[in-house]
Amino acid sequence: MDNQCTVQVRLELGHRAQLRKKPTTEGFTHDWMVFVRGPEQCDIQHFVEKVVFWLHDSFPKPRRVCKEPPYKVEESGYAGFIMPIEVHFKNKEEPRKVCFTYDLFLNLEGNPPVNHLRCEKLTFNNPTTEFRYKLLRAGGVMVMPEGADTVSRPSPDYPMLPTIPLSAFSDPKKTKPSHGSKDANKESSKTSKPHKVTKEHRERPRKDSESKSSSKELEREQAKSSKDTSRKLGEGRLPKEEKAPPPKAAFKEPKMALKETKLESTSPKGGPPPPPPPPPRASSKRPATADSPKPSAKKQKKSSSKGSRSAPGTSPRTSSSSSFSDKKPAKDKSSTRGEKVKAESEPREAKKALEVEESNSEDEASFKSESAQSSPSNSSSSSDSSSDSDFEPSQNHSQGPLRSMVEDLQSEESDEDDSSSGEEAAGKTNPGRDSRLSFSDSESDNSADSSLPSREPPPPQKPPPPNSKVSGRRSPESCSKPEKILKKGTYDKAYTDELVELHRRLMALRERNVLQQIVNLIEETGHFNVTNTTFDFDLFSLDETTVRKLQSCLEAVAT
């Protein structure tokens, strides 16, 4: 036994970082604390002689040595850095120490504090009886490698192999997902350093891919406020040391180290703070909601766009795109989505039904937002009460069926989010502006543009509330009257009736490709206003040529 036993012991490395309310006189913006400890109630002091933290050279006395627990360093800084951490053992033989490379990353402004935990599993092959006893007292576990008779010191590979699968990255809780890199570190210190390197490399690529996929999942989950579920999943995985992957989604923004990013992401989700021997550690773990800044930014974008339109059941993609370029012109958006539109055009027939449904739901969203917001164009509502009343009924009717359809379609849309939302995004704006875009789509495209100054001439004429509703979609009519008034001071009844009819047909329009063409036409005039869910324009603000083009588009649909 003495000659052929393997002992595995776990360590937890982690750090906590948060923004200071006010920077220090030296310009330090963050307070951080980094620590090394044992899992849960394990006292690593039994086998750890000291822990050496190598801070950045910019710190005074960058070599910090802790000979007694808690093994931690607290400092203030303005940037993250890679910190080598050496754990020295109370061992009279090799290995005498193990060195970890720790990524001390900080949270960006506006993001939650960092609460990061990294679990490492150290595997000691054939330790001396004395050192083995110390390891066991610190929570170490005896592991008998298969084929113990043949596996003794000459073959370090056996112990290492088990460590790799066991290693889990970024355990926010106290999971002991050894990084594999650490296992490799220990083993390398013992016998084979090359193994350690290879393990780390393997683990990192896995982490990268996992973090990417997980980041996407996280974004969706956050939009749905499913942090709790993700947390539960993470907990379930903890024992397996595999739970890090789901939380990995949060990339550590400040740092490039994928491992810690994953850890961080897990820590945010692994909400349960591991009971750390040092109290500060425990508290640090709770805040572990520090999502990597990037994911959080993406999530914020998506969530904001979704927030405005999630109720109508609009595809998340649409919303994300809308929030994407908050201040880019719709034209840019159209160009970016042009590619998607092309792809869509081919399968468009097959997915036509879906698109129509989505456009309906989007339209409804636009109605809601517009009726609530009554954009400036709405305020410029037409001066004819009769036309106003006409507008209202048409919009109200469209709203009723839209909502019912949206409710029916929401479930379908969620299932078809990827394909349909992709289509919507593509259709939203085609570089040539030929892409089909439902009003809501164009709205989402321009929702980013909502910051764009409304180019519609503020109508001096009465702003009837009904018109604000009409704007629900583009409120083409309400907006249209004011400009014509501005231009001519008066307008003939025949033309007004024509515009009223045009408005009615626009509001009843459901063909996505035609909607896109109309949006493109209006964009060229510059007389439109964009909100989170609507694309508003004033028919009276358009010149007669543009109105004729709109009518021709509708005629094409009718035929």
From Swiss-Prot:
Pro residues biased stretches: 270-281, 455-467
* Amino-acid biosynthesis listed as a keyword: no
**Which Pfam families does this one have?**
AHD (PF17793), YEATS (PF03366)
The record's listing under Gene3D superfamilies reads:
1.20.1270.290, YEATS domain
* Region annotation Acylated histone binding: where it falls in the sequence: 56-58, 78-80
Q: How is its activity regulated?
A: Acylated lysine-binding is specifically inhibited by the tripeptide XL-13m, carrying a 2-furancarbonyl side chain, preventing recruitment to chromatin.
The site feature described as Acylated histone binding is recorded at D103
Chain intervals with Basic and acidic residues compositional bias: 180-190, 200-263, 325-355, 474-484
A molecular function (GO) term = chromatin binding
List the PROSITE patterns hit by this protein, alphabetically.
YEATS
Cross-link position, Glycyl lysine isopeptide (Lys-Gly) (interchain with G-Cter in SUMO2)? K240, K262, K342
What this protein is reported to do is described as:
Chromatin reader component of the super elongation complex (SEC), a complex required to increase the catalytic rate of RNA polymerase II transcription by suppressing transient pausing by the polymerase at multiple sites along the DNA. Specifically recognizes and binds acetylated and crotonylated histones, with a preference for histones that are crotonylated. Has a slightly higher affinity for binding histone H3 crotonylated at 'Lys-27' (H3K27cr) than 'Lys-20' (H3K9cr20).
Return the protein name: Protein ENL
Q: Taxonomically, what lineage is the organism?
A: Eukaryota, Metazoa, Chordata, Craniata, Vertebrata
- Gene name on record? MLLT1
